[in-house]
C-alpha cells in the first residue's frame, strides 16, 4: 500500500495544480466582467442584484462571521501542521486547530438548529426547487457570459444553494475525521484509564472503538481518517476561494452586509445617485436581474 507521506505529496501536487488552474480561471472570468461591462455597472454604477425577502437577521450574520474566522484559523493552522515553516510552533498550532474545530462544530450545530427549529427557521431559502433545476442552465450560461442576465428566484440561486448544501456534509466529514486525529484527552476524562492510557481521546473513540474494528486495523482506520481529512481541507480551500470571488464580484452589497459593513454599501449608493442628480435613492434594480 502507498505510504501516507507519499500519498500526501501526490495530494499536494494535484490540488496545488488544480488550485492554480482555478485562480487563473477566476482571473479570466473577472477579465470577462471588465470586457462585458459588468464590472463597471456594478462597482462604478453600483447596480447589483435585487434580493427578494427581508434583510438578513443578526443571528445568521454572527454565525457566518464566527465560521469565517474559525475556518481561516483552521486553514492556516492546518497548513502549518502539514508544512511547518518554522520550528517550535506545531504544539501551539495544534491547539489553535483544535479550538477552531470546536467553534466550527458548535457553530454548525447551532446553525442547523436555527435553520430547522428556530422561530426564524430559514431552511426553505436553501432548498433546491423544481424551478431552480429548470433555471440552472440559464444561471450557468450567465456566468460564462453567454446570457446578459440570470434568473434570481429568491435570496440565492441554484449554484449558491448547491454550494451551501455541499458545505454541510463536508463539515460533518471534516469534524469526524478531525476528532479521529485528536490525541489530546477530552476535558474531565484525565482520571479515566482508556486504551491503556489516562484520558479519553477522539482517536480512541472513533478509530479505536468502531472505525478500527470496521476496517480490521486501527492503523488503517487512522490512515484513512488523515487522508480524507486532508483531501476535504483542500476541497474547502478550493470551494471557499470560488465562493469569496463570486460573493464579491456578483453581489458585493450582500458580502458587506454579512460582515456588518452595509453602511459602506449605502454610502456608495447614495453618492452614486447624488452624482446623477437624484435627491432620493430608489430601490436597487439590477440589470443582471431577470
Model-derived segments and spans:
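Membrane-embedded alpha-helical bundles that constitute the cytochrome b-like, heme-associated redox core
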Residues: 1-290
